[in-house]
Regions:
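C-terminal non-catalytic interaction/assembly regions of soluble proteins
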Residues: 247, 252, 256-375
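Anionic-ligand anchoring segments at beta-strand to alpha-helix junctions in alpha/beta enzyme folds, i.e.
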Residues: 52-54, 68-100
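Short glycine-rich or small-residue beta-strand-to-loop segments that form or flank ligand, phosphate
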Residues: 49-62, 82-85, 232-234
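Conserved, well-structured core segments that form the ligand-binding/active-site neighborhood
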Residues: 101-236, 242, 250
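Histidine-anchored nucleotide/phosphate-binding helix
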Residues: 58-80, 247-258, 264-265
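Short acidic-hydrophobic, aromatic-tinged amphipathic segments that line or gate anion-handling sites
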Residues: 29-37, 100-109, 204-207, 334-343
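Glycine-rich phosphate/diphosphate-binding loops that line cofactor/substrate pockets in enzymes
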Residues: 36-54, 73-78, 222-230, 257-259, ...
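N-terminal amphipathic/basic leader segments beginning at the initiator methionine
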Residues: 1-36
Length: 375
């Protein structure tokens, strides 16, 4: 009996699954660069004493890039370099940066174009990943989400499907790129995971993002046969998945591998609860799950409600989380599991004792596409 350990918040849980019931265990296998290689890539990043380092993510990879850049620029007064990130990433970024002398501040509420005029230089550092709405996530999409609500609404309404579309660059991404095509700022796109950095791309916002997408697609996209059920584990980093809102992309990025009427189970501890935005509005009764198609002003995480609504018609969606069952099942329609044994037992009862289960670890950093014969 294979013993599979899966990340669950700040700990790991064991999945005691019989060999004959395991279709495959897939995890990201990024080729990591050495510190010397990363430093060489970053050696051309020159800071000035009135520089804003804007981190669009709090991941370990982004934190490591920031630390190396600061170390390479010790000749200037680093106290005059501002490091800012979005409020939901402040705690995570602070925890991931080992140099506690670094001051990580929350980005203010002023418009983006007003904020950047205060600084002599702007350096944006982003973590390139897959995204179910935009296809890919990076500096253009994160800036659009957080600074341009009207354009974000336009991007959401421009989608060509109500289903997740990770790895597909469509109209929403085109809108994001068009908004920042003239942005005069240096951008670093990082491809990596909790173990290190795989690649660094330093250029203007469009070129850096485009290069990162090409690299990400080449190393993380693979093919696998579809399965009747899939157990999905979020990334090996605890911080980025403290809320349900920040965890669901792992489910959306993998759901296409599940056969119709099959089961998908997400493992996400969610120590900080539901999160803000549309999911919270839904569980608190301010928005209905059935009223999420768009048209009105976009609400953060609105795509989660859209995907829940659409995919519950096709799949049995479940989650193992610390969030109360009343919210998970009663409000969002997710079947709540209490442990890995219950997950396996229910999947076997539903699909048969000879059923084979696909297990995906680190779903943030891998995009698995169905083989053509299974589509």
């Amino acid at each position: 009996m294979p013993e599979i350990w899966l990340k669950y918040g700040g700990t790991h849980i064991v999945l005691d699954i019989k060999f004959e019931n395991l279709l495959k265990h897939i995890s990201s296998n990024l080729n990591l660069s050495s510190d010397a290689q990363v430093r060489a890539k970053l050696s051309g990043v020159v800071l000035k004493e009135n520089t804003l380092i804007l981190a669009t993510d709090g991941s370990i990879s982004v934190a490591r890039a920031i630390e190396m850049i600061l170390d390479l620029n010790r000749s200037i007064d680093l106290s005059k370099v501002s490091i800012e990130t979005f409020s939901k990433y402040v705690g995570t970024l602070r925890a991931n940066i080992s140099n506690k002398a670094c001051s990580i501040e929350r980005i203010g509420s002023e418009p983006f174009d007003v904020m950047i005029k205060k600084f002599q230089k702007i350096l944006i550092i982003s973590h390139t990943k897959h995204d179910p709405l935009f296809g890919y996530c990076g500096a253009p999409t994160m800036l659009l989400r957080n600074f341009y609500p009207d354009k974000m609404t336009e991007a959401f309404n421009s989608r060509v499907t109500n289903l997740p579309a990770p790895g597909i660059a469509g109209p929403p991404l085109e809108i994001a790129l068009s908004v920042f095509s003239e942005l005069r700022a240096e951008v670093i796109e990082v491809v990596g995971n909790s173990y290190g950095i795989s690649a660094i791309f330093h250029d203007n916002i469009i070129e850096a993002f485009d290069s990162a997408l090409g690299y990400l697609s080449a190393i993380t996209e693979t093919k696998e046969i579809s399965s009747g059920s899939t157990i999905i584990c979020t990334s090996n980093e605890e911080g980025p998945h403290e809320t349900l809102s920040s965890s669901l992309n792992s489910l959306w990025n993998s759901i296409h591998l599940v056969k119709r009427n099959g089961s998908a189970v997400l493992l996400a501890e969610n120590t900080q609860g539901i999160g803000n935005g549309a999911l919270r509005d839904c569980v608190e009764g301010r928005i209905e799950l059935q009223n999420c198609l768009g048209g009105q002003t976009y609400v953060e995480g609105q795509e989660h409600l859209l995907y829940l609504r659409e995919l519950q018609l096709q799949y049995d969606l479940g989650i193992m989380s610390t969030i109360p069952q009343y919210y998970l099942n009663g409000k969002l329609g997710l079947y709540p599991y209490t442990g890995s044994k219950e997950i396996l037992n229910r999947l076997m009862e539903k699909h048969g004792r000879n059923h084979k289960i696909l297990v995906i670890s680190d779903a943030d950093n891998i995009l698995i596409k169905s083989n053509a014969e299974e589509n």
